[in-house]
Amino acid sequence: DFIKAGKPALAIDPLRIAAGVDVAAEALAWAEGHIGQGPVLVYSTAEPSAVRAIQGKLGSEKAGAMVEDTIAAIARGLVQRGVRQLIVAGGETSGACVQALGITQMRIGAQIDPGVPWCHAVAPDARDGLHITLKSGNFGSTDFFTKAFAQLQA
C-alpha cells in the first residue's frame, strides 16, 4: 500500500473546500516539494463513517462534486507543472479530470490490472503527451498504485 510504505500522500478535506479554502492551491504547493522525487498521492477517501458525516453536512452530490472539481484542478495544475504521469481513481473524478485536462485523444497502452490500462493522452498542457490511467470502482489490486508506477519505470 502506497501510504503504508511511507510515500508522500495528502488527504483532501471536503469540509475545508466547503469553507472556501483553496485546497487545490494548497495541494499543488505541497506537491511541488515532491515533484521529481517520485510519485505522490492526493486522495479524498475516508472511513465510511467519516464519509457519511461529511455527506450529512454537505449533501452527497455537493460533497462529491466539490471533491471531483478540486481533484480535477489539482490534476490540471500538476500537468501544467510538468507532471506527465497521472493515476485518477474514481469514475466521476476520472471524468472531471479528463474534462479539466482537455484531453482530446487517448491511446490504450499496457494493462496494469484487469480492466485498467495505462493510456497515452493528448492534452493542451501536455503537448508532449501524458501517461494517464483512469481507475474506477473496484478495479485493481491492493498494490495497484505502486504496481502502476513501477510498470512505467520498467
Question: For the regions a protein language model found, what residue spans apply to each?
Answer:
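Active-site catalytic microenvironments in core metabolic enzymes, especially phosphate/sugar-handling
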Residues: 1-154
